Structure formats: structure tokens, C-alpha cells
């Protein structure tokens, strides 16, 4: 990447873009934590309805969807950092995964190697800008394909669970009103007659 006029405008532009991405990451984490809390509370309250034959099917449906939503929300906030390899780092600017500004990359380097890479970058404005642009790009891809993708699934699963559980409950009530008793799961042993 060739930079014609590195200056304060470019620095401000790159800094603001990076700050925006970091704020989006924080918002995604906050939303995932909210979904974890809400789905966990709903799941906890719903478990009590499993023993009631009138609500069993709706409760099972809601529990399944809440659990799936919790898993998606956890996956959204779960850190993904490559473990250090024994092969050493590849210091190749042509490698799209090479980003010495990200700790997941420089944990593969010795301090001397990292100092050398950073010295070269800070003394070459074009390379420094390329590293910053690459970091913004990889952070944006991570947000789009990892955080927000699974966060969206968490919210969709939770909303679907609420709607489907409501429909299941309405169907069970309709069947009972028609005199058809839906099949019940006996989670609690029946008490003996007369005892």
C-alpha cells in the first residue's frame, strides 16, 4: 500500500475507524451478555413448568430454544486466539493473516523479532499505514463473521423459541378443548391411588 501524504488527517481517519470497530465489539459483548442473562432466567423459570402436563410441551420447546440461544451467545463472546506454534512466526507482509499489531500474531515472535518488525514499521509510513489498515480489516471481519453472526443467531433462536412455545401451547389448549388429550411425558412419578 502506497501512502501519498501521510499526515494528521490519515492518522485521525484510521484512529476513528479503529475506535468505531472496538466500540462495536464492546456493544456485541454487552448484547451477548444481556441475551445470556435473559435466556438463563427464562430457562430457569420454565423448568418449573415441566411437571405440569398442561405446559410440558411448551416448556420443553422454550427450554430447548433458550439453551440453543445461550450456546450461540457464549460462542459470540468466546475468545479465539491461536496458540503459539513451535514452528515460529512467519514475517510475511503478503500473508493476509500476518498482523504484528494483534497479540495473537506477535506471541509467535521473540521480543527481538518483534522489535525489528515494529522498528521497520514506524520508520516506513507506508508500512505503518498498511499495518493499521490490515488491523482494521481483520477486526471488521472478526466482528462480522464471528461476533455479530453468532449474536444474531442467539437473538433469533430466543425469539423463535418464544413464538414456537406460544404456538405449541395454543395447539395443546386447542386439542384439550376438542377433547383430545395430548401425549404427556411423565417426568414426576404418579402418586399411588388412594395413598
Q: Where are the regions that the model predicts?
A:
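Phenylalanine-focused residue identity feature
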Residues: 9, 13, 45, 55, ...
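Loop-to-transmembrane boundary segments
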Residues: 122-160
Amino acid at each position: 500500500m502506497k501512502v501519498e501524504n501521510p499526515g494528521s488527517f490519515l492518522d485521525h481517519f484510521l484512529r476513528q475507524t479503529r475506535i468505531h470497530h472496538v466500540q462495536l465489539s464492546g456493544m456485541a459483548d454487552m448484547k451477548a451478555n444481556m441475551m445470556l442473562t435473559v435466556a438463563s432466567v427464562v430457562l430457569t423459570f420454565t423448568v418449573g413448568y415441566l411437571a405440569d402436563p398442561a405446559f410440558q410441551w411448551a416448556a420443553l420447546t422454550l427450554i430447548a430454544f433458550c439453551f440453543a440461544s445461550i450456546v450461540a451467545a457464549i460462542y459470540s463472546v468466546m475468545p479465539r486466539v491461536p496458540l503459539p506454534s513451535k514452528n515460529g512466526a512467519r514475517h510475511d507482509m503478503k500473508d493476509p493473516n500476518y498482523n504484528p499489531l494483534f497479540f495473537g500474531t506477535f506471541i509467535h515472535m521473540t521480543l527481538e523479532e518483534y522489535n525489528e518488525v515494529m522498528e521497520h514499521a514506524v520508520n516506513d509510513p507506508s508500512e505503518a499505514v498498511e499495518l493499521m489498515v490490515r488491523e482494521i480489516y481483520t477486526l471488521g471481519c472478526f466482528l462480522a463473521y464471528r461476533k455479530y453472526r453468532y449474536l444474531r443467531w442467539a437473538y433469533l433462536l430466543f425469539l423463535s423459541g418464544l413464538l414456537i412455545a406460544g404456538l405449541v401451547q395454543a395447539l395443546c389448549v386447542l386439542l384439550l378443548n376438542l377433547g383430545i388429550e395430548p401425549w404427556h411425558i411423565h417426568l414426576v412419578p404418579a402418586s399411588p391411588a388412594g395413598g
